Regions:
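Soluble acyl-CoA-dependent acyltransferase catalytic core bearing the H(X)4D motif
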Residues: 62-68, 91, 102-104, 137-138
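Aromatic/hydrophobic pocket-lining residues that form π-stacking "cages" and hydrophobic walls in ligand
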Residues: 99
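His-Asp-centered acyl/peptidyl-transfer active-site segments
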Residues: 47-55, 85, 102-115, 124-212
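Generic detection of short hydrophobic beta-strand segments and adjacent strand-loop junctions
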Residues: 28-29, 70, 87-91, 159-161
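Short amphipathic alpha-helical segments
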Residues: 11-17, 110-118
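Short, hydrophobic secondary-structure boundary micro-motifs
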Residues: 30-34, 68-73, 132-135, 200-203
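Active-site-proximal acidic secondary-structure segment that organizes catalysis
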Residues: 1-38, 123, 134
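Short amphipathic alpha-helices and their capping loops
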Residues: 17, 21, 35-87, 94, ...
């Protein structure tokens, strides 16, 4: 059983690696065990972590945002028993390779490009030049010893992206602007990563959106 509500990909890898070691030890009669850091160590770090830097960051990012970025202005979708419709688009090998090369040339990654592309989509369907949406973070990058911990660390936090300097495609400056926007998005994500353990409720309180 694997689900992000109880674990993440790295946890699954640690478990499978441990199983492989156990099987190997039975064959070779050796002890290759690796010490695992208790998950409670992460909980203690999270509880004792000062939040003033997180609060200052999210206030600077979100205090002027007073309306959620709701696609087509739809804020609440009724929950029904029907299976939601899904649309999938597979990026084939050649295009995937081109995307990796293009983003690497700008010192970024395809993940940064997809964040920027989604921001552009939201901006168009919401009629806004600044959007905010959730970005899923691993939660392990700023946690000492996390590479040896089993458990869930994933956190989803709001990312703000400005589209004011992003001209329409086909214009003479579009290419340069995409590169500039990609770099700006990379910087935004890098800053957000340094606050990846901040509670989502704290980020919400720092925005100008009224509580429901």
């Amino acid at each position: 059983l694997h689900h992000h509500i109880i674990s993440d990909h790295h946890t699954l890898k640690l478990v499978l690696d441990d199983v492989a070691r156990q099987l190997n030890e039975e064959k070779t009669h050796t002890d290759d065990s690796v010490e695992v850091v208790p998950y409670r160590a992460y909980i203690a770090q999270a509880l004792n972590r000062p939040q003033h830097e997180d609060e200052a960051y999210f206030k600077a990012q979100l205090s002027h945002i007073d309306t959620p970025t709701a696609p087509f202005g739809i804020h609440h979708v009724p929950v029904t028993a029907h299976t939601p419709n899904e649309q999938r688009y597979v990026i084939e090998g050649a295009l995937a390779s081109e995307l990796r090369t293009a983003t690497r040339r700008q010192g970024a990654s395809p993940a940064v490009l997809f964040h920027l592309a989604w921001a552009k989509v939201l901006g168009l369907i919401c009629g806004r030049d600044e959007v905010v949406f959730g970005s899923v973070l691993s939660g392990r990058q700023s946690t000492p010893g996390a590479e040896h911990m089993l458990g869930v660390f994933i956190n989803t936090l709001p990312l703000r992206i400005s589209l004011t300097d992003f001209p329409p495609s086909g214009t003479s400056t579009a290419g340069n602007s995409v590169a500039s926007a990609l770099k700006a998005t990379f910087m935004q994500l890098t800053e957000l990563l340094s606050h990846e353990r901040a509670p989502r409720a704290l980020a919400r309180r720092c925005s100008g959106v009224a509580s429901p």
